[in-house]
Amino acid sequence: LSGPDFLVHVGMLHGLDASVARERAHELLAALDLAEAGKKLISDYSAGMTKKIALAAALIHSPRVLVLDEPFEAVDPVSATNIRQILTDYTKRGGTVILSSHVMATVQQLCTHVAIIDKGRVLVAGTTDEVAQGGDLGERFTSLVGGVHSEEGLSWLGN
């Protein structure tokens, strides 16, 4: 299937009229810089394009809650900025986004609430500011989860 065909099918599966699904697919493809992919098969998409078409499929029926797994993984910086803007606009219009990410700077920038989970256990949860304790969320994550290794044994690097 091509990207446009896929999105129309997904929209119709969610109860959209075909013409509405086509219109929304066109808008989503343009917003996510996939319009030029045209009739290219999704199976031929790059990893970043695949991530973006999956996001478009999740958005096409305008759900109240959107659950995303690493939405910025494998996308270029311009696409990541576009996706952040789309998600920000979506939440301003009343939508809720639940996402997983290993990029704490993005989480701190985008999210109002956060939970840090390690090995299936919630270590801390609350507003982003509460969890970060007024500091950097990445540093807080590292302090809670651990795993920072010393450079011992790597003294040969850079020599």
Model-derived features: positions:
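A short, surface-exposed alpha-helical micro-motif characterized by mixed small hydrophobic
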Residues: V107-Q109
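Conserved catalytic motifs of ABC-family nucleotide-binding domains
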Residues: S62
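ABC ATPase "signature
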Residues: A125-G126
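Catalytic Walker B motif of ABC-type/P-loop ATPase nucleotide-binding domains
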Residues: L66-E70
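Helical segment within the ABC ATPase nucleotide-binding domain
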Residues: A80-R93
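Conserved ABC ATPase "signature" region
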Residues: V8, M12, S19-A37
